[in-house]
Amino acid sequence: MKSRLLIAGAIVGTLLVAACGSSSSSTGSPSPAAARATIAVATNSKLGQILVDAKGITVYLFVKDTGISSTCYTSCAQIWPPVLTGGPPQAGTGATASLLGTTTRTDGKLEVTYAGHPLYYFVSDKQPGDATGQGIDNFGGLWWVLTPSGAAMH
């Protein structure tokens, strides 16, 4: 319970900083680039094999999304930034290329999908191996790390 309160406090603090900060779009998460995103598999000490980006940062799915359509925008996307790509995403070590795809967000940017799930980062994950968003109930639904098959890791 205490860790959930700390996470909730971090989320509120992040929103306050974002609201009071400069016009920069920095969220503390990996910055979206025009390059093609790479999704790979890494071993997490607590969760086992999970999906990550090319830098080893954990990616998540949102259970509220339907099909490949993202439902996370505005304040949600500040806490859970989408994994963006400048073209077809690439499969890194352990990832299955046929499970990778994209969906077009309302702003026209391409978001990476895996096994039909739009992918997101969590703003509190700062380094490879962090998976602090696992199982959080936020913005009307649960957030899960993905297994190499693309299933939610419960």
Located regions from the model:
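Bacterial N-terminal signal peptides that target proteins for export
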Residues: 1-9
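C-terminal motif of bacterial Sec signal peptides marking the signal peptidase cleavage site
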Residues: 15-19
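Bacterial signal peptide processing site
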Residues: 21-23
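N-terminal low-complexity, Pro/Thr/Ser-rich intrinsically disordered segments
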Residues: 29-44
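Short, low-complexity cationic-aromatic patches
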Residues: 40-58, 104-117
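Hydrophobic core segments of beta-strands in well-ordered, beta-rich domains
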Residues: 59-62, 120-122
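A low-complexity, Ser/Thr/Gly/Pro-enriched, surface-exposed linker/loop concept
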Residues: 69-101, 141-153
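Extracytosolic low-complexity repeat regions of secreted or lipid-anchored proteins
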Residues: 95-151
